[in-house]
Amino acid sequence: MKEGKTLLKIKQNDTTQEIKQIIKPRSYELMFIINFNTSEKERNELIETYKKFITENNGEIIKVENIGEKDFAYPINKMKKGYYVLFDFKAYPDDVVRLQNLLKNNEKVVRFMVVRKNLKED
C-alpha cells in the first residue's frame, strides 16, 4: 500500500507535477445489510464488488465476515430480516466516501454503517 496518494496532477511547461496527499490509509469497519430476498449468488457478487472497489483503490481487506441472516428489531421497508456482512479494511478517507455512495445507491443494500477504528494508531 502506498504512503501517499496523488491528489492532483498539474501540467506546466511539459512537466507534470503531482501533489501528494500526506494522509495514510486508515482502518475502518463496514457493516451492511443485504435485502433478504436477494439470491445467494447476487449476495456473493455484491460482496465481491465492494471488496474489489476497496482493493482497486489501494485499500486492503483485513477481514470479511458473513454474519448471515438475522431478524430486525423492527421492520425496515416492510422487511423483517436481512443478510449481514462485516468488513474490516484499510483505505484512504476519500475512497471511503466513494464506497459509502456506492452502498447508498444500491437498492439491494438495506442499511450500512462505516466506522473508523484505531483513532490513536492512525
What is each residue range found by the language model?
Residues 1-82, 90-122:
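Long, contiguous binding/interaction regions
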